[in-house]
Amino acid sequence: MTRSLTAIIERDGDGYVSLCPELDVASQGDSVEQARANLREALELFFEAASSEEVSRRLSGEVFVTQVEVTCG
């Protein structure tokens, strides 16, 4: 079974941090591609190790990624 999840990747110093907000699972890498691949691996390990109750408890149904315009200064 496969599932589509959100991956948010942002630069952090010399590398990148990746986050899956639906499950609150994170990883990192030296490049965007590596951070994405490492997040995929972390998610696969989570699904292998977590009970169905843990998955249900942590899995949020809806995640919205959007931009917000704010006044600065």
Predicted features, each with a name:
Residues 8-22:
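Short aromatic-glycine-(Arg/Gly/Cys) micro-motifs in beta-strand/loop hairpins
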Residues 1-8, 33, 37-73:
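Short, charged, surface-exposed hinge/linker loops at domain edges
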Residues 15-17, 31, 63:
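Compositionally biased, intrinsically disordered low-complexity regions
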Residues 23-32:
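A short, exposed loop/beta-hairpin motif centered on an aromatic-Gly-Thr core
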